[in-house]
Amino acid sequence: MGTILKGMSRVRWHELTHAYGSAVGVPGRLSRVAWGDARTSASALSDLGLWLGELAVFDATVETVPSLWDLAVTDSVTNRSGVIKLLQTILEHANPPEIEVQQAAHRAVLDGRSVADVLARDEDAAVRAAAGELVAAIDSHVCESCCPSA
């Protein structure tokens, strides 16, 4: 793997799950986002969205978020705005049976707030727009697992 996704090889993907089972396919999809053309990247992001965020969040989601932040700031990635939108999707979804997983996934997105601020000033208008929406979502984020009532 290249320098963009260098930390990905340390993750034990075969031990993690996503919405449809084993997460062994996640690194390949992340690589397609990193180095694929627009069509390949969009297809890979669609898969990642279904697997990691649209239905619920999973342990594989938690491990994927740092790579998504990495992709979002890499100019050579063809669909950075799509990556940013996936981060927002992850922040907006839950996994009630596994509150700790939900909290960790949300925290991984929330911890990238300063990166989202930088992206909100990006030269690419689509990246700026997606990042602006993500910043707003981060700033207004309240969920039971992240902000338990006292």
Functional labels for PLM-detected ranges:
Residues 1-36:
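Long, low-complexity, highly charged intrinsically disordered regions
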Residues 2-7, 37-50, 83-94:
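HEAT-repeat alpha-solenoid elements in large eukaryotic scaffold proteins
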Residues 29-30, 67-69, 115-117:
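Buried hydrophobic core positions in alpha-solenoid tandem helical repeats
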Residues 36-37, 41, 75-77, 123-124:
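Short inter-helical turns and helix N-cap capping residues of alpha-solenoid HEAT/ARM repeat scaffolds
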Residues 41, 61, 80-83, 128:
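Residue-level detector of extended alpha-helical repeat arrays and alpha-solenoid scaffolds
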Residues 50-53, 70, 74, 89-96, ...:
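Positions within ordered alpha-helical repeat solenoids
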Residues 59-68, 99-110, 147-149:
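Short sequence/structural elements of tandem HEAT/ARM alpha-solenoid repeats
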Residues 109-113, 117-150:
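Eukaryote-biased recognition of C-terminal alpha-helical segments
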